[in-house]
């Protein structure tokens, strides 16, 4: 995800494998390292909850969790989630059943259960990540339904891209460049 931030800042596709572009992104990431307190999501989340950091790159569901924790702690600061004007990434968690699954019927029943509106709403409340289930969405409080961090509008989504699998060679390139960023 760190590379995505630099790619969007520089106007590159988040799935680029262009070495010149990625070197430029790497240089940006190295230049901003003195400002970074954490890259790992759990550390980022904890620093935001503790008021130690003023800015973070964080998933929308994590931000809802952080906002709830800050409010529950009685802290005297508010946190706002924004999608940068350059855009961000869009991601989707999915449930899949392998074609050779031994208990395919049970897996289908579990997915059907999780897709029930009431259960999807409960799952959303527990994991704090947005639900794509329209019936569950209708059960949410209007404050949550109107939370653009969870449910961005079409204008914000139009600025965002989906990560693609770049193959072993692409993964290796990103891994090598990330090692160089961390080593600095």
Which residues are covered by each model-predicted region?
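Mature extracytoplasmic/periplasmic domains
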Residues: 98-158
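Short, hydrophobic alpha-helical packing/hinge segments within bilobed ligand-binding/sensory domains
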Residues: 44-45, 53, 107, 120
């Amino acid at each position: 995800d760190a590379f995505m931030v630099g790619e969007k800042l520089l106007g590159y596709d988040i799935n680029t494998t262009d070495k010149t572009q990625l070197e430029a992104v790497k240089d940006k990431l190295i230049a901003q390292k003195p400002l970074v307190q954490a890259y790992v999501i759990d550390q980022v989340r904890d620093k935001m909850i503790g008021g130690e950091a003023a800015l973070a790159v964080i998933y929308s569901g994590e931000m809802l969790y952080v906002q709830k924790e800050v409010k529950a702690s009685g802290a005297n600061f508010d946190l706002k989630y924004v999608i940068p004007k350059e855009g961000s990434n869009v991601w989707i968690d999915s449930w899949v059943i392998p074609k050779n699954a031994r208990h395919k019927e049970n897996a289908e029943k579990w997915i059907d259960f999780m897709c029930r509106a009431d259960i999807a709403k409960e799952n959303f409340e527990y994991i704090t990540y947005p639900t794509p289930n329209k019936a569950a969405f209708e059960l949410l409080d209007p404050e949550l339904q109107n939370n653009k961090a969870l449910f961005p509008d079409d204008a914000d989504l139009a600025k965002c891209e989906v990560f693609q699998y770049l193959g072993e060679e692409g993964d290796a390139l990103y891994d090598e460049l990330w090692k160089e960023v961390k080593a600095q």
